[in-house]
Amino acid sequence: MSDNSDTNVSMQDHDQQFADPVVVPQSTDTKDENTSDKDTVDSGNVTTTESTERAESTSNIPPLDGEEKEAKSEPQQPEDNAETAATEQVSSSNGPATDDAQATLNTDSSEANEIVKKEEGSDERKRPREEDTKNSDGDTKDEGDNKDEDDDEDDDDDDDDEDDDDEAPTKRRRQERNRFLDIEAEVSDDEDEDEDEEDSELVREGFITHGDDEDDEASAPGARRDDRLHRQLDQDLNKTSEEDAQRLAKELRERYGRSSSKQYRAAAQDGYVPQRFLLPSVDTATIWGVRCRPGKEKELIRKLLKKKFNLDRAMGKKKLKILSIFQRDNYTGRIYIEAPKQSVIEKFCNGVPDIYISQKLLIPVQELPLLLKPNKSDDVALEEGSYVRIKRGIYKGDLAMVDQISENNLEVMLKIVPRLDYGKFDEIDPTTQQRKSRRPTFAHRAPPQLFNPTMALRLDQANLYKRDDRHFTYKNEDYIDGYLYKSFRIQHVETKNIQPTVEELARFGSKEGAVDLTSVSQSIKKAQAAKVTFQPGDRIEVLNGEQRGSKGIVTRTTKDIATIKLNGFTTPLEFPISTLRKIFEPGDHVTVINGEHQGDAGLVLMVEQGQVTFMSTQTSREVTITANNLSKSIDTTATSSEYALHDIVELSAKNVACIIQAGHDIFKVIDETGKVSTITKGSILSKINTARARVSSVDANGNEIKIGDTIVEKVGSRREGQVLYIQTQQIFVVSKKIVENAGVFVVNPSNVEAVASKDNMLSNKMDLSKMNPEIISKMGPPSSKTFQQPIQSRGGREVALGKTVRIRSAGYKGQLGIVKDVNGDKATVELHSKNKHITIDKHKLTYYNREGGEGITYDELVNRRGRVPQARMGPSYVSAPRNMATGGIAAGAAATSSGLSGGMTPGWSSFDGGKTPAVNAHGGSGGGGVSSWGGASTWGGQGNGGASAWGGAGGGASAWGGQGTGATSTWGGASAWGNKSSWGGASTWASGGESNGAMSTWGGTGDRSAYGGASTWGGNNNNKSTRDGGASAWGNQDDGNRSAWNNQGNKSNYGGNSTWGGH
């Protein structure tokens, strides 16, 4: 593309100097004079007259090749001629020009254009080409081609030089890049080559014209002015852009630089510091943590600081390199010292008390930012007149006022309300008769009262010294205007969250006791804000801010912010809790939630300046307290967390009482005499646990009464109730039918009778008469069902109660006692030896009968339903051998079956075949050769043939007291079953004749069979077996020489061996 592209560039188009040139195809149509002239004027705001004449001439006369060559070959006109020709063109522009004049003008304009082209070569690239100008230039394209080649080469060289000079200072504006991402596109040289090829292609096709044809477009003076104006405009724009950039940078620094520093300083004050500033550098000295006594941190910091100043003054220029000393409230028992070496710290801390220099720790670098992070200190700066509380001594918890502060801030002088007893409780030495003062203690301290010099003079004059009318010294302590002035260490004083009550503040008021409520409210405002709690629904009033005096209702609360719906506002607003105050009205029921009267309740009487006065339901006195310490409540009854209604409390070593009205600190009680009184919480020694108390009494009928039994009065109003407690000869009873004194009354046990006693309920279930041997001995032989003891029901009672036990665990192992109480797995045992009660696991006890006997464990006791084994008397302790026979055994041996041994036993559980009848004892045998189911004696007695076993002595003696001689009846003489004999002679079950052992009716005949001769149980013996018990008929038939039960002998079962499997 030619450098000489377009000279018709207006001032307005100069702003588009960076835009790409517009390519317009060459127009083949010939335009008339008027159209060409109009288009030329519209194409730019600044157009030279030479360009206008050239456009008119070229639009009317087609270009000729020969004429163009001649015009180029002519010498250039001087500058004056060019200006004259331009003037002539202006004068002749109104009329039509002739052909010769037109040719002359064309030649002159082309020469003038050549002069201006060299100066405008660098600016032609930057100027966009207008559409109409390109159309007008198309007619002159052929004329430029007719110039000489030498002129073209010279012009091109000059233009290239000028282009190089102009392109050097020109710089493109750098595109703003992202500082974090590399998003710059790479541009290759191939794209430039492609653009050059496209331009050459467009030139060949005629869409882009060369600048050679534009020599006639502008004259030298107009082009020079344009160039000067354009350059001046460029300079102005560059200067303006630089000024704008500097001004913008200055504004940014002023606007944001100042605010950022403010924000940084504010953030630093709030405790925020960028972490990069907290990190230690290479030159940072090490920090060591040194152990010290807890609570002495601040005091040690002050001591070490003083020591550092003293050492620096003493050592002069050679100072100890201690850079800093500090402590953190979060890390108790440790101070931190910054020094370059460990030896410096050891030398510096040597000799300082309460510092354990051997226990020091180097702080790691990673923990230094957290250690050095600034935090708001929670320490309260003490000032004269501020309130504090004392931490120790007899004044522990008392409110005090700061009077003076020492210079080193280690001690404070406090104004305290004294607690003095003036020697009332001092002891007197009996030998020397001198007063021995007792040191006051916190448990026995006197109530707070102002110092009374009259009382001190009367009771303890020796320790009183008067300095003036207002100042006294008593026991080496100063009292001014009745107040004690005493010095305390700063660590013995509590300075945080002090919330004094109105009563405490009244003691520090004037002599008349008046208190300025406004000053009180201001003094405790911060302390109250720390504990004040607002709940949704509380009515409040705004104290500070734009909405001061507005009232509303709390809708939501957070830690420090409360959302309030104010009256007259639709949108809820948020306020700090410290700017709010609760609202109460006379008649509201309130409860104290903070302070000394916490838990008290009452009815609001008066509200004045944030102070609420209400009538306490406990003390029936007026109490004044700040509004934010109250809460509106529906239940006006305040109770204590330690004592409740109907609790039995101990007032002294001998007096007890029952609480009939429980409050926070005041209680109404009824004592054992029935007197109702009001006491304080401090008057109660302890609470009696009635669930574990083992006290009892006896009613008018002699029945035992215990706690929990229901009783009724025998005389009077016959009040009925449940026993709460038994004290000596009085019973505390509570009734649901009585309203007075919460249903509690006191009655003597001799005037009541038990209605539902536990012992009565147990006695009704057990029939002890059935266990009396004397009553049982008068009864007939009991049956098996009659003998079985009834199963006793536990009825909810512990089976171990009242049992005699032996301890199996260490400590009291082997000792006997009786179980008095059982609570879960623990049993209270009263020892027989020491008359002492101990508590022990009930599974570690062995349970016995009261008379002795075999012991069992607790599990066995439960399985036996509380029954313990009976004690054995006399021969019953002898056990039977294991080879015991069911029938008779060898002579001289003692045998038993089912625990039946020989001897005399009066009990039913040991059936030993003596005089006592034994039921269902199939196998008891006597000594000698007595047989039991085939011999003469069947129940252990001795007989000779027909002797019965139901009596023992004599051969014919009756077992039930009768005497017989063989044939007599064993049930008292004469036969009771039809004839004379039933168990010894002929049975009357089949024959009615008189028999003395003739024949048996049990299946066969025998000589003397019934229970003595040949047995008829399954066999038939006609050989008249010996009457001494020959052959047995149990499944075998014998001549009498053998027993039917594998027993061999020549003797009868009356006197021989037993027939039950033994020899």
From Swiss-Prot:
Polar residues bias locations: 1-11, 74-112, 1043-1057
Residue ranges with Acidic residues bias: 145-167, 183-200
Chief location bin: nucleus
Alphabetized SMART domains for the sequence: CTD, KOW, NGN
GO terms of biological process kind: chromatin remodeling; intracellular mRNA localization; negative regulation of transcription elongation by RNA polymerase I; positive regulation of autophagy; positive regulation of transcription elongation by RNA polymerase I; positive regulation of transcription elongation by RNA polymerase II; regulation of DNA-templated transcription; regulation of rRNA processing
SS bonds (residue pairs): none
Annotated region (15 X 6 AA tandem repeats of S-[TA]-W-G-G-[AQ]), positions in chain: 931-1063
Keyword terms, alphabetized: Chromosome, Mitochondrion, mRNA processing, Nucleus, Phosphoprotein, Repeat, Transcription
The protein's name in its UniProt record: Transcription elongation factor SPT5
UniProt source species: Saccharomyces cerevisiae (strain ATCC 204508 / S288c)
